[in-house]
């Protein structure tokens, strides 16, 4: 399924999440797609931010994500999913 979402790396604890905008639901990339999503985030890091310990945590990636859940939906829980692609990428700094 394709969702409009925001990908963010939480630098303090290393959680990588894709929030499905307009919902209270988050996806976590599974092992097969974690590196792929990290590369998308890192592609949006400005040179001036690359000196931070976790530069990918300084930005948000908005876009249309193709996600394929690998576990059943459970209300209130993060759902692991294979993330196949993102279209219409837009990077925004974390406020």
What are these regions (language model features)?
Residues 40-95:
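Beta-strand-rich cores of mature extracytoplasmic or soluble domains
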């Amino acid at each position: 399924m394709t969702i409009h979402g925001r990908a963010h790396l939480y630098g303090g604890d290393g959680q990588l999440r894709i929030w499905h905008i307009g919902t209270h639901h988050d996806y976590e990339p599974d092992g097969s797609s974690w590196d792929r999503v990290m590369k998308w985030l890192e592609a949006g890091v400005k040179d001036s931010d690359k000196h931070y310990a976790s530069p990918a945590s300084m930005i948000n990636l908005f876009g249309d994500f193709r996600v394929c859940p690998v576990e059943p939906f459970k209300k209130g829980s993060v759902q692991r999913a294979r993330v196949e692609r993102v279209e219409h990428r837009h990077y925004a700094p974390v406020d």
